[in-house]
């Protein structure tokens, strides 16, 4: 019983123990969380939560897991990847990583990565294998391959394992490049072989492409192996020039120069020479070389040209330099060479046209006839007035340059001066007054022109152009042409086969002969001007008298017109101004045109021609001429015409004589005698009637009358009271017969018999009409006075 009870107690104790043990192992998750939280609160436990919050890690355990991951991943792990794999926050992992780096110096922390020492040893082994295969390796390439900084690879991997794991040599010029000695030996052999096979200048780039080595290594090795040539530079465009090629260049240049005395630049450049001129000088140090554009020549060739030129000058002939010089020389080369050879005295004795040299003596013998042509043409230009027109255009062109204000003031002063002199002339006598005015006019029209002709512009290039207007080209004249000179030269040059130079030579001599012709024309012009000036005073006086006579005639005719009925006067005034007024106007305009050297061909002028002269003449004439032309064309009142006519005379420096009634009576008497003389010699019935009526009017009124045939009827009606009845009847009958004759003559041929009958009647009455006019005496009418 007791043993059973003990057994029961033992079993109960075991059971209780079992119960207690089982309860400890089966704590619920909630209980565990509470227990851990309690430990953390009391500071007895430090844990790290996973990102999902389901697990706890201690710092030591996390450090161990990081190391395990580094080992699993081959000694290199990224903290970002590590954070994801361990499901731990990145900052916690970074803190642990920094602790590992501090505790273990063999571990490196680079760019967010942990790298073990054995990983770096493995990379060093791989680099060594690649270096052995390729022969050369660049840290930059390794940086791309391993995704590590260049400094880290260079300092922590390559240099630390150089000549241990990595068997190679660092480049002295570039610390990032490593190569093996065998690679250098192979490359040197390639370079040596390539350079030995080259016989002409070859680009270094072509050599590198053929050998398959980098230019850096080539530049390193070329000085060691280039015993048969040289490299021009270390730039990408460098050339390798073999010594054999340089030797061939030098021999070719020396031999060619020795045989020909010159070297063509293109030929030397074709040998591969870049600086041709310096190369020639270096290869021919003892020669006096002259560099031209396309070639370089030696002293021997220059002396040959000089001797040929001296012979040409001494014999007064010509020389074609192309026969002495090489054919490859351009015109510019020839010019440069001749500039060197020709001395100052020689240059005065020759003319150069491309490659042909003519002596001046040779040309002057052929060109002598041109002097006669120039003189002859100059004389013709003066005789025809062409040179005078040129001088006028030139003078007007220069006058246009003067400012308007200054020009107006000068002209006003001159006009005042002329008026003062005109007043002085009237006081001292007509002849003296005219002389004073003539001198003033001469000074205005000729003096400035002489100054213009003395300028150098007279001898400029000749080309016809219109002058005298603003904006026009400079006035010029061509007295001798290039064609004239060329024609003279062509004959002499053709004999020598140089006719192609005729035009060029003519163009060369053209300015000289143009100046000669202009100078001769000016000389002849001055002579003719002097001769013309001697007659100018008398011509001016004659024109003044003529215009005074016309002026007085118009004035006296106006008095006669005023005696007629008012309805007849306008027609007679119009006829008077259209005839005598136009004559007066034309004389004034012809005079001004001559003074201003304007074109005024013909004996009469139309209204348009007079307008053009008024527009082109000097300012001192323009206003008066325009008013005169307007008054003449409008045929208004005679008084208005006489006013503008007097103004035009003053503008032309002419004096209007005072009215003298005694002279007026003499003029009327002379006019009557003139009409009687015409009547005595006249046989035409219409003209007989016209003259008879005018004579009767002059005698009966003691006034002159200027009328046309259409006004005969009106005048005859006016004279009826002054005639005897039989005289009036005779004149009326004669007048009717004249009208009948004119109408019959304009009719058909059937009226021919009537015309003959009328003519017979007129022939019978004509002596009677002439007798009436010739013997008529004033009876009962007061005179015009």
From Swiss-Prot:
Keywords: Transferase, Ubl conjugation pathway
Protein name: E3 UFM1-protein ligase 1 homolog
GO BP annotations, alphabetical order: protein K69-linked ufmylation; regulation of proteasomal ubiquitin-dependent protein catabolic process; response to endoplasmic reticulum stress
Matches recorded under InterPro entries: Ufl1, Ufl1-like_C, Ufl1_dom, Ufl1_N
Origin superkingdom: Eukaryota
E.C. code: 2.3.2.-
Basic residues bias spans: 439-449
Bias kind Basic and acidic residues: ranges: 396-416
GO terms for cellular component: endoplasmic reticulum membrane
Region Disordered: start-end pairs: 396-473
UniProt key word Cell division: no
GO MF terms held by the record: UFM1 ligase activity
Source organism per UniProt: Culex quinquefasciatus (Southern house mosquito)
Function text: E3 UFM1-protein ligase that mediates ufmylation of target proteins.
Family statement: Belongs to the UFL1 family.
């Amino acid at each position: 019983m007791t043993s059973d009870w003990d057994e029961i107690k033992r079993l109960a104790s075991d059971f209780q123990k079992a119960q207690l043990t089982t309860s400890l192992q089966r704590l619920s998750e909630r209980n565990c969380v509470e227990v851990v939280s309690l430990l953390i609160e009391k500071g007895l436990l430090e844990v790290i939560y996973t990102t999902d919050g389901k697990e706890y890690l201690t710092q030591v355990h996390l450090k161990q897991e990081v190391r395990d991951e580094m080992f699993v991943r081959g000694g290199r792990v990224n903290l970002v990847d590590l954070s994801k794999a361990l499901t731990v926050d990145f900052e916690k992992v970074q803190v642990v990583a920094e602790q590992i780096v501090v505790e273990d110096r063999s571990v490196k922390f680079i760019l967010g990565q942990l790298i073990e020492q054995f990983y770096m040893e493995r990379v060093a082994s791989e680099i060594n294998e690649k270096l052995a295969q390729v022969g050369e390796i660049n840290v930059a390439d390794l940086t791309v391959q391993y995704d590590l900084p260049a400094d880290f690879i260079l300092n922590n991997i390559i240099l630390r394992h150089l000549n241990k794991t990595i068997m190679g040599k660092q480049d002295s010029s570039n610390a990032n490049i490593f190569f093996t000695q065998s690679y250098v030996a192979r490359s040197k052999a390639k370079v040596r072989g390539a350079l030995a096979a080259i016989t002409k200048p070859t680009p270094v780039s072509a050599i590198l492409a053929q050998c398959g080595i980098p230019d850096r290594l080539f530049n390193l090795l070329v000085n060691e192996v280039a015993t048969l040539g040289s490299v021009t530079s270390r730039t990408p465009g460098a050339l390798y020039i073999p010594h054999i090629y340089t030797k061939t260049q030098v021999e070719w240049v020396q031999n060619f120069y020795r045989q020909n005395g010159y070297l063509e630049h293109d030929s030397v450049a074709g040998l591969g020479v870049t600086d041709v001129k310096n190369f020639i000088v270096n290869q021919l140090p003892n020669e006096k070389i002259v560099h031209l554009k396309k070639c370089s020549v030696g002293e021997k060739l220059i002396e040959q040209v000089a001797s040929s030129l001296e012979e040409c000058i001494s014999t007064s002939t010509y020389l074609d330099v192309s026969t002495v010089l090489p054919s490859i020389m351009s015109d510019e080369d020839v010019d440069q060479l001749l500039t060197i050879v020709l001395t100052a005295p020689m240059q005065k004795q020759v003319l150069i046209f491309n490659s042909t040299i003519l002596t001046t003596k040779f040309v002057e013998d052929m060109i002598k006839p041109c002097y006669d042509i120039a003189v002859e043409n100059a004389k013709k230009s003066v005789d025809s007035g062409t040179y005078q027109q040129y001088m006028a255009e030139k003078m007007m062109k220069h006058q246009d340059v003067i400012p308007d204000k200054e020009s107006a003031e000068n002209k006003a002063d001159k006009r005042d001066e002329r008026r003062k002199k005109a007043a002085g002339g009237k006081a001292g006598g007509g002849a003296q007054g005219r002389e004073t005015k003539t001198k003033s006019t001469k000074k205005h029209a000729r003096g400035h022109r002489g100054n213009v002709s003395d300028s150098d512009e007279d001898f400029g290039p000749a080309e016809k152009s219109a002058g005298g207007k603003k904006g026009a080209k400079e006035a010029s004249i061509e007295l001798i042409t290039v064609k004239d000179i060329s024609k003279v030269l062509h004959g002499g040059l053709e004999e020598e086969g140089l006719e192609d130079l005729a035009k060029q030579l003519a163009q060369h001599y053209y300015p000289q002969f143009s100046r000669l012709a202009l100078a001769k024309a000016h000389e002849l012009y001055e002579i003719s001007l002097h001769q013309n000036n001697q007659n100018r005073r008398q011509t001016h006086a004659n024109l003044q008298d003529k215009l005074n006579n016309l002026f007085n005639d118009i004035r006296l005719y106006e008095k006669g017109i005023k005696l007629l009925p008012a309805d007849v006067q306008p027609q007679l005034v119009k006829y008077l101004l259209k005839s005598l007024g136009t004559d007066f106007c034309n004389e004034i305009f012809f005079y001004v045109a001559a003074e201003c050297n304007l074109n005024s061909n013909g004996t009469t002028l139309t209204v348009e021609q007079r307008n053009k002269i008024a527009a082109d003449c000097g300012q001192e004439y323009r206003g008066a001429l325009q008013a005169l032309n307007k008054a003449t064309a409008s045929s208004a009142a005679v008084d208005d015409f006489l006013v503008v006519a007097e103004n035009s005379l003053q503008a032309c420096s002419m004096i209007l004589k005072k009215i003298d009634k005694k002279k007026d009576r003499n003029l009327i008497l002379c006019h009557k005698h003139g009409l009687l003389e015409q009547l005595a010699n006249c046989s035409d019935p219409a003209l007989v009637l016209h003259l008879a009526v005018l004579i009767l009017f002059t005698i009966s009124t003691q006034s002159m009358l200027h009328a046309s045939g259409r006004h005969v009827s009106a005048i005859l009606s006016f004279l009826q009271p002054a005639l005897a009845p039989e005289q009036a009847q005779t004149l009326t009958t004669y007048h009717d017969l004249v009208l009948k004759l004119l109408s019959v003559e304009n009719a058909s041929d059937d009226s021919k018999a009537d015309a003959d009958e009328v003519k017979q009647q007129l022939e019978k009455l004509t002596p009677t009409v002439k007798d009436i006019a010739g013997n008529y005496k004033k009876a009962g009418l007061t005179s015009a006075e």
